[in-house]
Amino acid sequence: MAWLDQSARSLFLAEFVSSFLLAMRYFFKPKVTLNYPFEKGPLSPRFRGEHALRRYPNGEERCIACKLCEAICPALAITIEAGPRRNDGTRRTTRYDIDMTKCIYCGLCQEACPVDAIVEGPNFEFATETREELMYDKNRLLANGDRWEREIAKNIALDAPYR
Protein backbone atom coordinates (compact mmCIF):
# COMPACT_ATOMS: atom_id res chain seq x y z
CA MET A 1 0.00 0.00 0.00
CA ALA A 2 2.94 2.29 0.71
CA TRP A 3 4.21 1.92 -2.86
CA LEU A 4 0.78 3.03 -4.18
CA ASP A 5 0.81 6.07 -1.92
CA GLN A 6 4.36 6.93 -2.99
CA SER A 7 3.59 6.60 -6.73
CA ALA A 8 0.46 8.75 -6.37
CA ARG A 9 2.48 11.51 -4.69
CA SER A 10 5.22 11.41 -7.34
CA LEU A 11 2.62 11.39 -10.14
CA PHE A 12 0.93 14.43 -8.61
CA LEU A 13 4.27 16.23 -8.33
CA ALA A 14 5.18 15.42 -11.95
CA GLU A 15 1.79 16.65 -13.18
CA PHE A 16 2.09 19.81 -11.11
CA VAL A 17 5.56 20.61 -12.44
CA SER A 18 4.60 19.98 -16.08
CA SER A 19 1.49 22.14 -15.82
CA PHE A 20 3.47 24.90 -14.11
CA LEU A 21 6.10 24.84 -16.88
CA LEU A 22 3.37 25.00 -19.52
CA ALA A 23 1.83 28.03 -17.83
CA MET A 24 5.21 29.76 -17.59
CA ARG A 25 5.91 29.12 -21.28
CA TYR A 26 2.71 30.92 -22.31
CA PHE A 27 3.18 33.62 -19.68
CA PHE A 28 6.26 34.99 -21.45
CA LYS A 29 4.94 34.72 -25.03
CA PRO A 30 3.41 37.78 -26.74
CA LYS A 31 -0.25 38.36 -26.00
CA VAL A 32 -2.80 37.49 -28.69
CA THR A 33 -5.81 39.18 -27.14
CA LEU A 34 -7.09 42.29 -28.95
CA ASN A 35 -8.61 45.26 -27.18
CA TYR A 36 -11.60 45.05 -29.56
CA PRO A 37 -13.20 48.44 -29.90
CA PHE A 38 -9.79 50.07 -30.28
CA GLU A 39 -7.96 47.28 -32.13
CA LYS A 40 -9.41 45.25 -34.98
CA GLY A 41 -8.11 41.90 -36.15
CA PRO A 42 -7.70 40.86 -39.78
CA LEU A 43 -10.75 39.64 -41.72
CA SER A 44 -10.74 36.90 -44.32
CA PRO A 45 -11.55 37.98 -47.90
CA ARG A 46 -14.43 35.51 -47.68
CA PHE A 47 -15.91 37.12 -44.58
CA ARG A 48 -19.70 37.49 -44.83
CA GLY A 49 -20.94 40.62 -43.12
CA GLU A 50 -23.46 43.33 -43.91
CA HIS A 51 -25.17 43.08 -47.30
CA ALA A 52 -24.59 45.59 -50.08
CA LEU A 53 -25.76 46.21 -53.64
CA ARG A 54 -23.00 47.16 -56.05
CA ARG A 55 -22.95 49.58 -58.97
CA TYR A 56 -21.07 49.56 -62.27
CA PRO A 57 -18.27 52.15 -62.59
CA ASN A 58 -20.64 54.38 -64.60
CA GLY A 59 -22.98 54.56 -61.57
CA GLU A 60 -25.71 52.23 -62.82
CA GLU A 61 -26.83 49.53 -60.40
CA ARG A 62 -25.73 46.02 -61.26
CA CYS A 63 -28.87 44.14 -60.24
CA ILE A 64 -30.76 42.86 -63.31
CA ALA A 65 -33.78 41.64 -61.34
CA CYS A 66 -33.24 37.98 -62.20
CA LYS A 67 -34.49 37.05 -58.70
CA LEU A 68 -32.03 34.18 -58.31
CA CYS A 69 -30.98 35.45 -54.89
CA GLU A 70 -34.60 35.58 -53.77
CA ALA A 71 -35.18 32.03 -54.99
CA ILE A 72 -32.08 30.53 -53.38
CA CYS A 73 -32.38 32.25 -49.99
CA PRO A 74 -33.14 29.46 -47.46
CA ALA A 75 -34.41 31.95 -44.87
CA LEU A 76 -36.74 33.76 -47.32
CA ALA A 77 -35.17 37.04 -46.24
CA ILE A 78 -35.00 38.69 -49.70
CA THR A 79 -37.94 40.34 -51.48
CA ILE A 80 -37.55 41.69 -55.02
CA GLU A 81 -39.96 43.46 -57.33
CA ALA A 82 -38.85 44.04 -60.90
CA GLY A 83 -39.78 47.08 -62.92
CA PRO A 84 -40.88 47.01 -66.56
CA ARG A 85 -38.30 46.26 -69.23
CA ARG A 86 -36.33 49.26 -70.38
CA ASN A 87 -35.76 50.30 -73.99
CA ASP A 88 -32.55 48.28 -74.18
CA GLY A 89 -34.38 45.14 -72.96
CA THR A 90 -32.87 45.02 -69.48
CA ARG A 91 -34.72 45.12 -66.19
CA ARG A 92 -33.95 46.80 -62.92
CA THR A 93 -35.51 46.40 -59.50
CA THR A 94 -38.08 48.76 -58.10
CA ARG A 95 -37.93 47.09 -54.70
CA TYR A 96 -35.07 45.15 -53.14
CA ASP A 97 -35.57 44.39 -49.45
CA ILE A 98 -33.58 42.19 -47.10
CA ASP A 99 -34.92 41.32 -43.67
CA MET A 100 -31.71 41.05 -41.67
CA THR A 101 -33.56 39.48 -38.74
CA LYS A 102 -34.18 36.42 -40.94
CA CYS A 103 -30.83 36.32 -42.75
CA ILE A 104 -28.49 33.50 -41.75
CA TYR A 105 -25.45 34.91 -43.62
CA CYS A 106 -24.97 31.76 -45.66
CA GLY A 107 -23.72 33.62 -48.75
CA LEU A 108 -25.94 31.74 -51.20
CA CYS A 109 -27.39 35.00 -52.54
CA GLN A 110 -23.89 36.19 -53.36
CA GLU A 111 -22.99 32.92 -55.08
CA ALA A 112 -26.20 32.85 -57.12
CA CYS A 113 -25.89 36.39 -58.48
CA PRO A 114 -24.67 36.29 -62.11
CA VAL A 115 -23.47 39.93 -62.09
CA ASP A 116 -22.03 40.19 -58.54
CA ALA A 117 -24.70 42.72 -57.59
CA ILE A 118 -25.54 41.48 -54.09
CA VAL A 119 -22.52 40.86 -51.89
CA GLU A 120 -21.81 40.48 -48.23
CA GLY A 121 -19.31 43.13 -47.29
CA PRO A 122 -16.64 43.45 -44.61
CA ASN A 123 -18.79 45.35 -42.10
CA PHE A 124 -19.85 43.43 -39.00
CA GLU A 125 -20.61 46.39 -36.74
CA PHE A 126 -24.22 47.14 -37.59
CA ALA A 127 -26.01 46.78 -34.28
CA THR A 128 -29.33 48.60 -34.00
CA GLU A 129 -31.78 49.55 -31.31
CA THR A 130 -34.96 48.53 -33.13
CA ARG A 131 -35.97 45.70 -35.43
CA GLU A 132 -37.17 48.16 -38.06
CA GLU A 133 -33.60 49.33 -38.60
CA LEU A 134 -32.71 45.78 -39.67
CA MET A 135 -35.11 45.90 -42.62
CA TYR A 136 -32.78 46.97 -45.42
CA ASP A 137 -34.29 48.59 -48.50
CA LYS A 138 -32.71 49.22 -51.88
CA ASN A 139 -31.39 52.67 -50.97
CA ARG A 140 -29.63 51.44 -47.86
CA LEU A 141 -28.14 48.48 -49.71
CA LEU A 142 -26.85 50.76 -52.48
CA ALA A 143 -25.40 53.13 -49.87
CA ASN A 144 -23.60 50.18 -48.26
CA GLY A 145 -22.22 49.22 -51.65
CA ASP A 146 -20.99 52.75 -52.30
CA ARG A 147 -19.39 52.91 -48.85
CA TRP A 148 -17.61 49.55 -49.04
CA GLU A 149 -16.94 49.29 -52.80
CA ARG A 150 -13.15 49.42 -52.56
CA GLU A 151 -12.96 46.63 -49.99
CA ILE A 152 -15.64 44.55 -51.72
CA ALA A 153 -13.88 44.77 -55.10
CA LYS A 154 -10.56 43.79 -53.50
CA ASN A 155 -12.14 40.79 -51.74
CA ILE A 156 -13.87 39.61 -54.93
CA ALA A 157 -10.59 39.89 -56.84
CA LEU A 158 -8.78 37.86 -54.16
CA ASP A 159 -11.51 35.20 -54.22
CA ALA A 160 -11.75 35.03 -58.04
CA PRO A 161 -9.36 32.07 -58.51
CA TYR A 162 -11.55 29.93 -56.26
CA ARG A 163 -14.89 30.65 -57.92
Curated annotation (Swiss-Prot):
Q: Which organism is it from?
A: Parvibaculum lavamentivorans (strain DS-1 / DSM 13023 / NCIMB 13966)
> Which terms in the Gene Ontology molecular function aspect does this entry carry?
4 iron, 4 sulfur cluster binding; iron ion binding; NADH:ubiquinone reductase (non-electrogenic) activity; quinone binding
Per UniProt, residues of the 4Fe-4S ferredoxin-type domain are 53-83, 94-123
Q: Does the keyword Cell membrane apply?
A: yes
Its UniProt entry gives the catalysed reaction(s) as:
a quinone + NADH + 5 H(+)(in) = a quinol + NAD(+) + 4 H(+)(out)
Its needed co-factors are: [4Fe-4S] cluster
Q: Which domain of life is it from?
A: Bacteria
What is this protein's record name? NADH-quinone oxidoreductase subunit I
Give the enzyme's main class according to its UniProt record, as a single word.
translocase
Gene3D superfamilies for the chain: 3.30.70.3270
**NCBIfam families, alphabetized:** NuoI, PRK05888.1-4, PRK05888.1-5
Alphabetically list the UniProt keywords: 4Fe-4S, Cell inner membrane, Cell membrane, Iron, Iron-sulfur, Membrane, Metal-binding, NAD, Quinone, Repeat, Translocase, Ubiquinone
Q: Name one GO cellular component term.
A: plasma membrane
Location in or out of the cell: Cell inner membrane
**Which residues does [4Fe-4S] cluster 1 bind?**
C63, C66, C69, C113
Q: How is the cofactor bound?
A: Binds 2 [4Fe-4S] clusters per subunit.
